[in-house]
From Swiss-Prot:
MF-aspect GO terms: hydroxyacylglutathione hydrolase activity; metal ion binding
GO process annotations (BP): methylglyoxal catabolic process to D-lactate via S-lactoyl-glutathione
Protein name: Hydroxyacylglutathione hydrolase
Residues that bind Zn(2+) 2: 60-61, 133, 171
PANTHER family, A to Z: HYDROXYACYLGLUTATHIONE HYDROLASE, HYDROXYACYLGLUTATHIONE HYDROLASE GLOB
SMART domains: Lactamase_B (SM00849)
């Protein structure tokens, strides 16, 4: 049976996610920005939390773990090299591991850059990618701990997934990301279409995710650093893609 996925707004602009297996009743939270909204969503659905899948150690992604674990006695799956930072972890994960949530399965991808321990979770059967702060809609995370080449390789790993996968990211940053991207690719038709869609969704108070990876590949300038016209637009024709990506990320940092 397909997973039931619920988007749970948390904190100021974080997304929490509940992934429920209707066949077994198992439910996973992808990260735990804060406990109260997730508990409310679980209560509304009549679900019990069985697992938390942590993407990285930043406080706005793990702040609710202790309370949720105490309430539900759920298993906490966390990056293998975040041991000292996520003390509540029961299972340590690395590239190629598989997490089972009831009858659902998630592949673990290491996607370092934003942090060195960052993981993304791929639910192949449900065509869902939970990329947290590696890949945003029309954006990507700041590179706090890694390097620009490292982050670019992580983005390439996610870009290689099929177009029909849906992206579930860590924050509602899409409107500001669109504004920035249009400054580099004002004539990108896919980006223009996404901009209109985002404006409409936000006007209705709706989240801008999920979005398909196919759409992101056409409209997200951070995934397009190896496109010659993008390199030219930032004054780096012929430069290596990782360097072009770094320039785009620096512009976003300073914008």
């Amino acid at each position: 049976m397909p997973a039931d996925i619920r988007i749970v707004p948390c904190l100021t602009d974080n997304f929490g996610y509940l992934v429920h297996d209707p066949a077994t009743g198992a439910t996973a939270s992808i990260d735990a920005p804060e406990a109260a909204p997730l508990i409310a969503a679980l209560d509304k659905e009549g679900w019990k939390l069985t697992d938390i899948l942590v993407t990285h150690h930043h406080g706005d992604h793990v702040g609710g773990i202790a309370e949720l674990k105490k309430k539900y006695q759920c298993r906490v799956h966390a990056p293998h090299d975040a041991n000292a930072k996520i003390a509540d972890a029961d299972v340590r994960l690395q590239e190629g591991d598989v997490v089972r949530v009831g009858d659902l399965t998630a592949r673990v991808l290491e996607t370092p850059g934003h942090t060195l321990d960052h993981l993304s979770y791929v639910f192949d059967d449900d065509r869902a990618l939970f990329a947290a702060d590696t890949l945003f809609s029309i954006g990507c995370g700041r590179v706090f701990e890694g390097t620009y080449p490292m982050m670019w390789e992580s983005l390439l790993k996610l870009r290689a997934l099929p177009d029909d996968f849906k992206l579930y990211c860590g924050h509602e940053y899409t409107a500001s990301n669109v504004k920035f991207a249009l400054g580099i690719e004002p004539d990108n038709a896919a980006l223009q279409a996404r901009a209109k869609q985002v404006e409409s969704l936000r006007a209705e108070g709706k989240p801008t995710i999920p979005v398909t990876l196919g759409e992101e590949k056409q409209a997200n300038v951070f995934l397009r650093a190896d496109v010659p016209s993008v390199a030219a637009a930032v004054g780096m024709p012929g430069a290596p893609a990782a360097e072009v990506f770094g320039e785009i990320r620096e512009r976003k940092n300073n914008g």
